[in-house]
Structures are given as structure tokens and as C-alpha cells.
Amino acid sequence: MKKIIALAMLVLFVSAPVFAQKYASINAKRANIRTCAGTKCALKWHAWRYTPVIMVKTNEDKSWVLIKDFEGYSGWIRADLLSPKGGMSAKVDLNVRKDPSASADIVCTVAKGYPFKYLAKKGKWIQVSDEPEKAKDGVCKGWVYNAKLWGFFKQ
């Protein structure tokens, strides 16, 4: 009996960090992700609106947040550029479809890592929309099979 309790406690403590993860999404058209907490730190990459991230930790005054994306890349971002609203990223290059069906017409095709805003869910399909960098590019709005997306949404 003691072994069972000890094993249960071990599982609880080992898995606790998984339950404690906090998610956010980028809330700026384009955000700079840096090597450390500060505008003088080197730029690592850019993240786009709706990109979902895991918040790892903050600096002392909570003005910067260390984030990690779906591929495990990490960097620092100003806290005011994050939102608790959901976002999704394409886990692979994928087709966005007119209706929630693999046989539906393709509306647009996006590359791995492309960020989306969550709109709705129907079965195992997620309705998404983007915010193109240039208005002339048009909005990509449609349905994606949920296994091809990484992220979170608030219902």
C-alpha cells in the first residue's frame, strides 16, 4: 500500500509542471523575440499575431516574459505584447478548406508555423482566420483538421 501511495505522489509531483503551464498568444502584428529581457538584447526572430506560446517565466518586474513556441524555440518578449486570447499555429504545411471536410475545396495553403485566430470548432475540425501582413494578400479563412494545429483557444 505504501508503494502505491509513494508511486501516486511521484506521478503527481513529476507531472505538476505540465498542469502549471500558462499559454498566451502574440497580440501585435509583428513582435520581436529576443535573447534576453530588454530592447538592447539581440533579436532572435519575429512572431506574428495569434502565434501561440507557452509562458516559461518572467523577469523580476514582470515586464518581459520568456516564451517557448510549438517547436521548442524560446526567447524573451515584452509582456504587453501577449494576450490570454487563443491562437493556433500550423504544425505542418497545410491546406485550409472551405468546409470541415477533407474533400472540401482548398481556400488557401499555408506553411508550417503559420499563425491563426481560432473562430469555431466542429467535430475534429477548427475554423480559423489569419491577419495577412499586407491587405492585398487577402484573408485566409476556413477549416483545418485539428491534429494539424498547435495552440489553444478560450471558449
Label each region the model flagged.
Residues Q21-N32, A37-G38, A42-W48, P52-E60, ...:
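Boundary regions of SH3-family modules and the immediately adjacent low-complexity/disordered segments
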Residues K57-K62, K121-K124:
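Short, charged beta-turn/beta-strand-edge "cap" motif at the junction between a beta-strand
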Residues I4-V14:
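Sec-dependent N-terminal signal peptides
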